[in-house]
Amino acid sequence: MIHRKASLKGLSRFFLLLACAALFTGCATQSPTASGGPGSSANPAATTDKKDLKDVRVQLSFLMQSLDAPLIVAINKGYFAEEGLNVSFERGFGNADTISKLGTGKFDMAFSDMYNALEFNEKNPNDKVIAVAVTQNKAPFAVLSLKERGISSPKDLNGKKLGAPAGDGPRKLFPLFAQEVGVDPKSIEWTTMEPKLRETFLLQGKVDAISGFSTSAIPSLLKAGKKPEDITTFYYTENGLDFYGNTILVKDSFAKANPEVVKAFVKAYFRGMQDVIKDPTAGLDAVIAADQSKLMDRQAEKVRLDIALKSMYVTPEVEKNGFGAADTARLQETIDQTVAGFGLKSKPQVADIFSDQFLPPKEQRQVPPAAERKPLS
């Protein structure tokens, strides 16, 4: 009898273990909680079997930064999955390189500017790329100096030494900027360096000013110990060159073959953008969490995102037309300026580089009301 009781007790324990194992397995198959990393989401749509989703390969313009918050948020919250897409991304190595790789078909979509794309299209007419949405309404093209250099207006650049990498977009457009502000471009002595050394050359006094993106240069200068009031910034957009910033680019042949995929991507991306505008701190935190290297400087990324929020993402034009759109007259003027600045032989029109047919209805890409926008902290 004692042995029978012992065996029954053993069976009870066995079935109890089986029940626990089944319970544990059931719990393990539930939707993951949002952790801020790519692919994680509190949205059940994000857990859709990837076999049912269309893979979309995306390249960034450079290293992942806080400017990529709309993309990361849209991934995390399952917005792309809801549209039937499985989005993966890789870092870029500069706008021109990103466009080149897009043109070869290595990626399906990319974040870069239309102006370098114009130059690429002229050289590669059979691999043409087009912009399907504007993500930055104002370009961060700028010439930057330090107050200690005594350059207080653009005209003070006459006869100075400027520095930038050879392929830098703002450097290539500098003659147009010079024409607008009354600087003789022939009086400028250019020093060429690697992109990572640009701010170092300025800090060390090897150059009087640099050309580049304010979103890259200003965070680097602040990280090096400079204060905002120490930095002088001359934006091209404030000096006669009203360029758009980065866009969502696709290969023209891909867009024609996959119009619904492009539309789905753009729609989900701007849902992410709307969330970032509403809560930029959450967007910043999502990017920091997605950084697998864990080397990202949160303060520098905060500065970068703050610049974008104040002057690139939301402008009077975006408030009027919604995210993603482009003003035809403004864009054509900047295309013409690019043709002159880059020395292009062709004379492209807006339709040759930008299409709004992939944008969602205007009501789906409106700027959130000011009352719904939290400050960046």
Spans of features found by a protein language model:
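Short, low-complexity disordered leader/linker segments with a strong preference
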Residues: 1-53, 363-377
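Short helix-capping segments at alpha-helix termini
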Residues: 79-83, 180-185, 224-227, 293-297, ...
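Pocket-lining segment of extracytoplasmic ligand-binding domains
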Residues: 116, 197-200, 206-296
